[in-house]
Curated annotation (Swiss-Prot):
Record flagged with keyword Secreted: yes
Its biological purpose: Peptide with unknown natural function. Has neuroprotective activity since is shows potent antiseizure effects in acute (kainic acid (KA) and pentylenetetrazole (PTZ)) and chronic (temporal lobe epilepsy model induced by pilocarpine) epileptic models. Protects against the KA-induced seizures after intraperitoneal injection in a dose-dependent manner, indicating that the peptide can cross the blood-brain barrier. Is more efficient in the KA-induced than in the PKZ-induced seizures. Does not adversely affect motor and cognitive behavior.
Any one cellular-component term (Gene Ontology): extracellular region
MF-aspect GO terms: ion channel regulator activity; toxin activity
Full protein name: Occidentalin-1202
Tissue: Expressed by the venom gland.
The organism of origin for this protein: Polybia occidentalis (Paper wasp)
Localization annotation: Secreted
Domain of life of the organism encoding this protein: Eukaryota
Keywords: Amidation, Ion channel impairing toxin, Secreted, Toxin
Signal sequence residues: none
Complex formation: Monomer.
Length: 9
């Protein structure tokens, strides 16, 4: 779920 972390940024 790396895309999730990038989504918040």
């Amino acid at each position: 779920e790396q895309y999730m972390v990038a989504f918040w940024m």
